[in-house]
């Protein structure tokens, strides 16, 4: 199937703004009966589906509150787990291989090269070269630490390692860092910059949740997955560049990033997870690349300022309410358009106006359709 494009002058007499017209040449591999039916009956494909009853404002508000509550409960569970970590930490300190490094105010497991616990009160520290792992809960709740430098010997940061370090403003990562554990930097509210090394391959669930001062995020080249809640409620985050190895974006990964305006998604992503970008109220446009096969439930829920969506016809699996609450989403561009049906049902949900992708209809009929449904911009 091949398509040709014609530019159409704006019709000043009509209120409908027709941006682009595509004419479709029928594919030779289509059954003759199908081609004949469309040729003989050119209006067959312009049937307007029955409009589904709109959800009331009260019902929509209740749905939104339920989704938000689900995300907050998930985050609360991770914080509760961190709160009971002291007992586990005490057991680690009792290990016979753990010694006290008085010079650096640390408990260190010499056998594994793990920094088990930091007990100092300085505002800036450099981790010794002998350390390969920052242990779980090692700096949890430290109230004085503002800056930390990790040597290139460090390959792992375990779960809750720096969570609730409310004074932490800067961390220099090891150039050989491979993984960051669950909730490792949870609620480090003054942490401003995240300069990840190229070696980083895994970021755990909730790792940077509620790091509310981070403004820009460039994810490393070899990261394969953005885990659930990884950057949840990073409220000053404005820009995200998702690198070329990421295959999936997890549940609520960027939910409640209220100031997020720009997201660049690489051509490696196949799944945008449930609530992944929900409540990103400042997001104005998004391009879903052709590699994405699934846009999950509530993926862009409540993105109230989203006006432009570019999405490939290859993206066939758009889940329930994926774009619900995007009440200003008026312009939908279908990339790599062909003669196959493109379901718009989930994109239309919860919006004040309907954008419909029409095929094989003339301009006059398209304008008539647009006037009937109050469409300000129509792509055909």
Residue ranges of model-derived segments:
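A structural signal for leucine-rich repeat
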Residues: 347-348
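Structural signature of tandem-repeat unit edges
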Residues: 71-110, 119-133, 143-156, 166-179, ...
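Charge-dense, low-complexity intrinsically disordered segments
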Residues: 1-62, 72
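Intrinsically disordered, low-complexity cytosolic tails and juxtamembrane linkers
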Residues: 64-67
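Consensus positions within tandem repeat domains that build extended binding/scaffold surfaces
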Residues: 136-138, 159-161, 182-184, 204-207, ...
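Hydrophobic residues embedded in beta-strands of well-ordered beta-sheets
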Residues: 113-115
């Amino acid at each position: 199937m091949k398509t040709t494009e014609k530019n159409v002058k704006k019709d000043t007499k009509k209120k409908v703004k027709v941006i682009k017209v595509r004419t479709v040449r029928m594919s030779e591999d289509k059954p003759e009966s199908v081609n004949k039916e469309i040729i003989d009956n050119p209006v067959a494909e312009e049937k307007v589906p029955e409009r589904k009853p709109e959800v009331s404002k009260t019902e929509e508000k209740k749905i939104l509150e339920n989704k938000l509550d689900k995300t907050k409960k998930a985050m609360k569970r991770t914080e509760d787990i961190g709160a009971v970590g002291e007992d586990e930490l005490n057991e680690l300190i009792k290990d016979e291989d753990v010694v006290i490094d008085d010079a650096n105010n640390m408990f260190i497991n010499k056998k594994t090269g793990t920094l088990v616990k930091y007990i100092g009160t300085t505002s800036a520290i450099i981790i010794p070269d002998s350390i390969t792992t920052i242990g779980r809960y090692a700096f949890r709740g430290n109230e004085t630490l503002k800056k930390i430098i990790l040597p290139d010997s460090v390959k792992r940061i375990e779960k809750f390692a720096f969570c609730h370090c409310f004074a932490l403003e800067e961390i220099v990562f090891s150039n050989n860092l491979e993984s960051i554990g669950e909730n490792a930097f949870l609620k480090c509210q003054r942490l401003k910059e995240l300069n990840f090394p190229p070696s980083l391959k895994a970021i755990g669930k909730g790792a940077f949740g509620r790091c509310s001062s981070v403004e820009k995020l460039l994810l490393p080249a070899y990261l394969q997955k953005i885990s659930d809640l990884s950057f949840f409620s990073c409220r000053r985050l404005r820009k995200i560049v998702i690198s070329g190895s990421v295959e999936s974006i997890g549940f609520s990964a960027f939910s409640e990033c209220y100031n997020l305006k720009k997201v660049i998604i690489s051509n490696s992503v196949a799944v945008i997870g449930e609530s992944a970008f929900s409540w990103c109220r400042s997001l104005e446009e998004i391009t879903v690349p052709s590699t994405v096969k699934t846009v999950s439930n509530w993926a862009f829920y409540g993105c109230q300022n989203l006006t432009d969506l570019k999405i490939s016809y290859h993206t066939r699996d758009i889940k329930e309410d994926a774009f619900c609450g995007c009440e200003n989403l008026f312009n939908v561009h279908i990339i790599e358009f062909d003669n196959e049906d493109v379901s718009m049902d989930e994109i239309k949900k919860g919006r004040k106006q309907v954008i419909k992708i029409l095929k094989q209809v003339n301009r006059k009929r398209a304008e008539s359709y647009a006037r009937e449904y109050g469409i300000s911009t129509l792509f055909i």
